[in-house]
Amino acid sequence: MGTDNHCSKHVFVTGGVVSSLGKGLTASSLGSLLKARGLKVTMQKLDPYLNVDPGTMNPFQHGEVFVTEDGAETDLDIGHYERFLNENLSGQANVTTGKVYSAVIAKERRGDYLGDTVQVIPHITNEIKERMLAMEEGHPDVVIHEIGGTVGDIESLPFLEAARQVRHEIGRENVFFLHVSLVPYIKPSGEMKTKPTQHSVAALREVGIQPDAIVCRSERPIGKGIKSKIALMCDVEGPAVVSCPDAPSIYLIPKVLHREGLDAYVVQKLSLFFRDVDWTTWDDLLDRVRKPRSEVTVALVGKYIDLPDAYLSVTEALRAGGFANKAKVNVVWVASDSCATAEGAAQQLRDADAICVPGGFGIRGVEGKVGAIRYAREHKVPFLGLCLGMQCAVIEVARDLAGIKDAASSEFDSQTPDPVIATMAEQVEAVAGKADLGGTMRLGAYPAKLAKDSLVAELYGTTTVTERHRHRYEVNNAYRDRLEQAGLRISGTSPDGGLVEFVELDRQTHPYFVATQAHPELKSRPTHAHPLFRGLVAAAVGHAKAASKGAAKESSTKVADK
């Protein structure tokens, strides 16, 4: 659409009082609203931790690693951005302190600074600014930057200073600061307190930033009196104080922010040309969210279920599969260890209409994943395996159908006599500890060719697909013939046929048994469910209906007997 003056406008989203307020969802929702107004929008996450990327971080601490098309290992908020914008982002959408310092130190070693004393200001802040302004490539109308952490944290200061300098350099009329803050409700007194927000804004002012608008996160809607008080004490206009209470679905947040007038206020302050919001696609989504025609239970069998964010994209992809089928998906978290025995698997999975086994690393919980897959196969419960989930499916079939009793992965047992899952040739040094672990896996989008009459080809509607990957191990080609003879169909491979990408069981044998080496959840969108997840939920709906009919028939038989 274009803007006046500077080619791109910049919106900086900061957070105050506590972490995990929903800055990422707020930023994503604003981005979706601006895009629905006809503006070209892109987004960036600025993380203050010293890790270069989250690729080697513990999932229990950080949550999932979101892999972009170009192979960058990024923060899970990038997943929110892609899902809400319905666009792919690149690795430059995630900047960490580790990346910034690594780049600055490398420049110092090369002599790029010509003998200068390298300091946080200006060298670190200049590097951050370069990465902020690099988002203008492609000439977006708006760049939304989310600054991680909480205002007042030492780690965030260089990013806040860089944002302040960007405003100074490109003009105040081209920059908008949006602060997300907590307004707690004190139950004994029945009051909502504004003091934490006042202190948070005061801390922001100390670094030279006055917010243009404040999004107030709370348990319940904020009344006009509280809004007026925040506007007065924090020196923002009345319409700039936005109430954003907890919502039953994250996909309702854009509606909440629009009703509060945030998107209209932003485009007004930034002098953006825009149209009214086109709700066609989003309203259809919300109709599916609010009015499901059926309900299914999907068991997600994982190692990191104590932190659901470790599987954020998987759960959102399952829900999107539900939206596509007008079904409500209830995700039941199952610790993989609990499925290691047949009895344990039966107890945990007997009520599941479908089973999803996602990715992971390390030996813990693997036998439980194999046990869950065995249960899915034997009881004909719809199954989808992702990355390690596919590898475990291959191990299960090798052991129980192909008679390879010692089948295992070289990741878990380097001495196994039957490594049906083996280390990729280019990953041997990294696995042996002779190369860096960070950023060295098979990462990013890779093509695959699908067998013409396969279930996966039918689901995708094509025989050529591209999916994102993150792995070091692969199906051992030495066992492919034995696996296929046992009934496991290799339905998709790399274009040269050398790497197994998809496996499945014949539909005459099992209603839906599909697994992939890829991470298809990373390409799913709430408005465009991924074919594999759409297919899984469709099969789950069929399974639930069959189970319901079976239960009804059994009940009527008992009545007749009486």
From Swiss-Prot:
Active-site residues annotated for this sequence: C387 (nucleophile), H519, E521
UniProtKB keywords: ATP-binding, Glutamine amidotransferase, Ligase, Magnesium, Metal-binding, Nucleotide-binding, Pyrimidine biosynthesis
Region feature Amidoligase domain, mapped onto this chain: 1-272
Binding residue positions for Mg(2+): D77, E146
Enzyme Commission number(s): 6.3.4.2
Binding site for CTP: S19, D153, I154, E155, K193, T194, K195, P196, T197, Q198, K229
Residues that coordinate or bind ATP: S20, L21, G22, K23, G24, L25, D77
Biological processes, Gene Ontology terms: 'de novo' CTP biosynthetic process; pyrimidine nucleobase biosynthetic process
Any one Gene Ontology cellular component term annotated for this protein: cytosol
Keyword ATP-binding among UniProt keywords: yes
GO terms for MF: ATP binding; CTP synthase activity; glutaminase activity; identical protein binding; metal ion binding
Protein name: CTP synthase
Keyword Metal-binding: yes
Gene3D superfamilies: 3.40.50.880, P-loop containing nucleotide triphosphate hydrolases
Residue ranges of the TM segments: none
Domain Glutamine amidotransferase type-1: 297-546
Subunit (UniProt): Homotetramer.
